[in-house]
Amino acid sequence: MGFFVTSSIDIVKVRGDLVFWKYKRLWGKAQLKSCYDAVIIGGGLHGLATAYFLARDHGIKEVAVIEKHYIGFGGAGRNTAIVRANQRTKENLPLYDEGLKLWPKLADELDFNLMFFNCGNLNFAHSEAGLNALRLQVASAQFLGIKSELLDPKQCKELVPGLDISDRIRYPIFGAMYHPPGGTLRHDAVVWGLAKGATRLGVHIHQGTEVLGIGVEDQRVVSVETDKGKIYTPRVLNAAGGYSARISSEMMGIRLPIHVLPIQAMVTEPLKPFLNHVVSSGVYHVYANQSLKGEIVTGSHMDPWPSYTTQTTAHYIKHQAEALTELLPCLKGVKFMRAWAGLADMTPDMAPIIDGNDHIQGYYMDCGWGYFGFKSAPITGKYMAQFMATENCPEMLKPFTLRRYEEHRLMGETASPVNYGPEFGWVT
């Protein structure tokens, strides 16, 4: 079932002071066919973006996106919608940088307001060691031509006047990495925009449809079994987010080094604009930004145990309140309005697993993004579509192969604002 939003409303009739409106579906509802050129498991941003670029760039329009619930049900609709390219490794930075530049173009192309707000990101350091780590991070970004700089506490205060830079807080601010190209978007707008663009090009989106199995003959994908019937296809993309490792293990016999950890987020009541940048602290385990509606959107570190629960806990809400009011004392007394949780599919090196045709011909994987999935979705979808259409992995994606774990080529990506829980192992 499609969503209805104000950008697709027609005035039907005006009678006196009454205005009658007609709502149009952003995307249609298609019958499940018995044969598709490609099947994508997961109606999140990576799946929708790949479907869109398969149709747009490669003429592969017989594509089915299979979603067990509704599109955007998983991480696509539960994240805090922050985008940035301030990672540290040479493999990650070019991908995120190119992805950051794609967002404004995508909004024009889809003819859909994704509400991109280029507000910049501030990542705080609370010790000399933390400041040295940020110097390395800034140098890595600048080496690749990505705008980033190191700020002292007074410069941080100029950008965020409400920030407490005194030494009275538990962890005083020593400085910050400022990343001007970063910002925020509206995550549901991105989901709807990509769905609209994909279906306009002929892609079929099947919500409320569960994948039960993947058929393989002679080490080649031949079909997908769903609760609505069998689909014959030569290509399958596993883009199921938190459930991707389970699908890969149970349906394909390929175990992935992924832990699934709940990650929680909250929003406050609307406030007058005062926070013009995304702020984050790895020591306080908090990141926050102010939405266009005035709410403070904030997240924390992940739960310290593997789980598929999406329930929130009082402990994390209390932690967020304490951390936010230390960094931004003006938030004392502000109410949290709601909280939610999503699933982060974490790998040992905090980098994704992107692979295809290595184990089974026609089986592709785009998973293990943790809480970086939103930032990378459109650009990864573009390259993933190229991979599936040509059967040749683009250079940009080659470092993320599953074989890097067997070959001991872990990325070591540590440029994240939060810690990520327990020791990792080969789990499903």
Region spans (language model):
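C-terminal catalytic lobe of FAD-dependent flavoproteins
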Residues: 325-428
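Active-site substrate-recognition segment that forms the wall
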Residues: 52-56, 81-83, 112-120, 213-221, ...
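Glycine-rich FAD pyrophosphate-binding loop
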Residues: 55-77
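Short beta-strand to alpha-helix junction loop
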Residues: 94-97, 124-133, 177-196, 206, ...
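Glycine-rich Rossmann-fold phosphate-binding loop(s) that bind the pyrophosphate
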Residues: 42-48, 68
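Dinucleotide-binding Rossmann-like beta1-alpha1 core, especially the glycine-rich loop
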Residues: 80-162, 285, 323-324
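Helical element adjacent to the flavin cofactor pocket in flavoenzyme catalytic cores
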Residues: 176-235, 243
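Extreme N-terminal leader/targeting segments of oxidoreductases
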Residues: 1-38, 53-61, 423-428
